[in-house]
Amino acid sequence: MVEKVPMTQNGFVKLQEELRWRQQEERPRIIEAISEARAHGDLSENAEYHAAKEAQSHNEGRIGELEDLTARAEVIDLTKMSGSKIKFGAKVKLIDEDTEEEKSYQIVGDQEADVKAGRISISSPIARALIGKEVGDSIEVNAPGGAKAYEILSISWG
């Protein structure tokens, strides 16, 4: 059975845009670079040719990965999400119980995660600790710098 990959509509659109760019713009550009480098003669010591072939390999690998991800995508409609328990798509405001620092995160798919932008992967330790919890609950997360305790201040959707 094919394992579905949960993601938001935004995340799915970004993957589709990258796939289109790699197939329709980057692939032809690389093919042209290979053709130009090939015209320079001896391929055994042609750095431009080898660089272009390496770029082609990387691009084709990423195209395969993107095709797989978009085929297995399970797009979650965040506008239909609600409830008092944290699940995929939730926007959560936490307070560090030691430093009193507030943090806000949205739980998203692995491909969409960007901690600096406040989006954490559903498979991250903090998201796994948050799933199923409610406002007022406390969680403990084992972080690289040691265990951190947070209290959940709010949950929102969309």
Curated annotation (Swiss-Prot):
A molecular function GO annotation: RNA polymerase binding
Pfam annotation, one family: GreA_GreB
PROSITE patterns: GREAB_1, GREAB_2
Any single biological process term in GO: regulation of DNA-templated transcription elongation
Gene3D superfamilies: Transcription elongation factor, GreA/GreB, C-terminal domain, Transcription elongation factor, GreA/GreB, N-terminal domain
Alphabetical UniProt keywords: DNA-binding, Transcription, Transcription regulation
Domain of life the protein comes from: Bacteria
Chain's role: Necessary for efficient RNA polymerase transcription elongation past template-encoded arresting sites. The arresting sites in DNA have the property of trapping a certain fraction of elongating RNA polymerases that pass through, resulting in locked ternary complexes. Cleavage of the nascent transcript by cleavage factors such as GreA or GreB allows the resumption of elongation from the new 3'terminus. GreA releases sequences of 2 to 3 nucleotides.
Family, similarity comment: Belongs to the GreA/GreB family.
Protein name listed in UniProt: Transcription elongation factor GreA
Native species: Rhizobium rhizogenes (strain K84 / ATCC BAA-868)
Organism lineage: Bacteria, Pseudomonadati, Pseudomonadota, Alphaproteobacteria, Hyphomicrobiales
